């Protein structure tokens, strides 16, 4: 299970990158949207299974991911259209939105759920973001 928790965030990021690279052509906006919504659905299901979320919590997690991941995607697209090549800027955008998601999760989850989420990978992700800030 720990292996899954380690691999899942990396796989989720690659979920958006690898299919486009494998096709050697840009994905259509519809394909990108479908892929993002599939990822959001899987992540909501994963968190529901791990944390035993109530229905209203599932709704807020889904809404948070939908809003924040779309906002992150839009910000990354604006960097790409400006032809920014500095990967640190892209990671900064990603870290900013992942931090925002964690802040929102902390408000949605009860204390026991937050501790379980934090131990299942949230804390490690935060440490990695903190290292990149230095």
Across the structure, where does each feature detected by a protein language model lie?
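Charge-rich (acidic/polar
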Residues: 23-134
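Bacterial Sec-dependent N-terminal signal peptides
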Residues: 1-28
């Amino acid at each position: 299970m720990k292996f899954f928790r380690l691999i899942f965030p990396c796989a989720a990021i690659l979920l958006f990158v690898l299919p486009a690279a494998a096709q050697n052509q840009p994905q259509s906006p519809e394909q990108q949207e479908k892929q993002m919504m599939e990822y959001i659905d899987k992540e909501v299901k994963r968190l529901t299974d791990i944390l035993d979320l109530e229905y209203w919590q599932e709704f807020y997690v889904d809404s948070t991911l939908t809003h924040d991941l779309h906002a992150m995607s839009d910000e990354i697209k604006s960097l790409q259209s400006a032809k920014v090549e500095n990967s640190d800027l892209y990671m900064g955008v990603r870290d900013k939105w992942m931090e925002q998601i964690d802040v929102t999760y902390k408000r949605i989850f009860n204390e026991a759920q937050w501790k379980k989420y934090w131990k299942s990978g949230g804390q490690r992700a935060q440490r990695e973001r903190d290292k990149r800030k230095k």
